[in-house]
Every structure is written in C-alpha cells, then in structure tokens.
Amino acid sequence: FPDVWIMGEVIHGDYPAIVRQSGMDSLTQYELWKAIWSSLESANFYELDWSLKRHNEFLESFAPQTFVGNHDVTRIASRVGDAGASLAMTVLFTVGGVPSIYYGDEQAFRGVKEDRMGGDDAVRPAFPASPDDLPGTGEWMYRLIQGLIGIRRRNPWLTHAMTTPVTVDNRRYAYDAVGHGGERLHVELSLDPAPHAVVSGSDGTVLMRVQHGD
C-alpha cells in the first residue's frame, strides 16, 4: 500500500528506532507536545528550545506527528488560556513535522482531563449536529488556524524543516525554521506585554501577526 501513511501512538521510547524497526511512517511527538504547553504555562521558553533541539534529531530520520491536543489530554485552551493557545498553534504550524488538530481545538474548545472513571468525557464532547450550532466563541481560533495552514501550504518544505534558535529567554523566544534547500521562516514568540507572535518570511515580510486576549 504505497499511498498509505501509517502513524503510531508512542509516549516514551527511542522514537527513531521504533519508526525504523516497525516500518511506520511516523509517530506521536509527545515530547514536543509537553514542551509547548509547559513552556507557556511556566513562562520558560528554555524548555521549548531544548525540546526543539531534540525534535531536530528526530527529523533527521522521520517527520514526527505533532500536536497540541488529543483524546487523552487536557485541551490546550484550558491548559494555557486562549492567548497561550494561539502561540501554541503558531509553534505547531511553523516547525518541522506533520501537524494535526484534535477536533474542537480549532474552535478553542475547553476541557480538563481527570484521573477518574469518565475523566476523559470533558475532552471528548459530541459535536453539534451542524456547524451553525457551534457557539461562535471559537471563530477567532478557526480563522487563526486557517491562516497558519495557508502559510504551511505555501511552504511545504516545513514538513522537514530544522529549527534554529535566534533569541532565547524565559518570556521571549525567536527561531528560524530552515528548509534543506535554504528556505527560511522567522518566528518570534513573546509573553510580554501580552502573549503574541509574529511570523515573517526570509525577506522580512510579515506573514502573520498573532495575538488574542483571554
């Protein structure tokens, strides 16, 4: 089945070895998932920088499946708020890998996973019968993700892009996403005075400004 893409859910282990030995195309990048929300929650971009260096190592052998939410974890908007979630999405779509969106995160759904019977229910709600029945409060996130997907489609090399840090401190992080052919995007993340991000092309042209208040 040459046109089938096979991805496995793996939490811990030697990611490259598992991909190589299993024959899978990709697996879940839980290390990066954790670093994205944790660095925003604790105002510690050094954690994200460390994880992205590890992510570069994985990209040398396969393109990890990247995410900021799934069926087993607290939703990103509940974890870091709407403003933090907008930065998390920016990182997701501007680093190497195969990004995916967990249903409802594109509408900034909230839900906290609990360690009890039925504790996943809050992060696995039923969709309304029609998009018209959505509350509308998450439209801003839908539009943000549309814009980020547009950037990624225009820059398909991002799937295998390496991340090069430019500025790193607790509350500000700037990096370049660099393609194998020399292509480049520049991304700036900041928590001050409020969480915001800027995505620029290699010529300095601003492609997107990201900011959303809780």
Predicted ranges, named:
Residues 1-64, 91, 110-147, 151, ...:
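Active-site-proximal helices and loops of the catalytic beta/alpha 8
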Residues 3-8, 98-105, 156-162:
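Acidic/polar loop patches that form or flank catalytic/metal-binding clefts of enzymes
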Residues 7-9, 66-69, 102-105, 187-190:
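Short beta-strand segments
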Residues 58-82:
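Active-site clefts of carbohydrate-active enzymes
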Residues 63-64, 99, 171, 183-185:
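A generic secondary-structure signal marking the coil-to-beta-strand transition
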Residues 83-89:
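Short, acidic/polar
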Residues 93-97:
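C-terminal substrate/ligand-recognition segments
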Residues 157-183:
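Surface beta-strand/loop "capping" patches
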